[in-house]
Amino acid sequence: QFEELLHNLGSLSKEDEDWARRYTMFCDRVARLLATTGLRADLRYDIAETLSDWRTILKFVDLPANILDFGAGCARQGLSAYLRHPDNIYTAIDGTLAGYTIQNTVLSCMDALSPKSAFCDFLDYEVATKPYPDISQAEKGSRFHVPVWMAEVVIPERFYDVVIAAHVHNELSGYDCT
């Protein structure tokens, strides 16, 4: 199946190869935080799918862009957005604990490697009883993390250039799909 993905992608540009190298290097660093045995994830499918996703995205929007990732999984789209253009504004939304936790780890690592802090997790603001940031007033390069139950209140209308919902359909209940 991986060979089929590669075949469908066609040849990789130097930019694609550079992106894949930086993506893998970043994921390796995050993996060292999570597993001390040297175990690493097989990123082949993530890389192939993400390259395919971004080839489509870039046909419709120029970067930097405002990107909403609903059901952000392991935050691969957020990492890709960051690696492709540091001024992209990225918002991850999720409602599952495991997904939210790994997204927080990835987005926090991105923030630690950035020249200035640009990451805001809305759960942190809720716990601290502080007012939520206004995403519509975000500075270039900002990254936001929003639990799904807050989305209706804090996600601005008509703000995003791209909405990504990769692999979300199978997680929705039958009621949500009708």
Put a short name on every predicted segment.
Residues 1-48, 133:
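N-terminal accessory regions of S-adenosyl-L-methionine
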Residues 171-178:
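A short, conserved alpha-helix within the catalytic core of class I
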Residues 74-86:
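Conserved SAM-binding loop of SAM-dependent methyltransferases across substrates and taxa
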Residues 47-64:
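Conserved alpha-helix/loop element of class I SAM-dependent methyltransferases that forms part
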Residues 89-94:
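Conserved SAM-binding motif I beta-strand of class I
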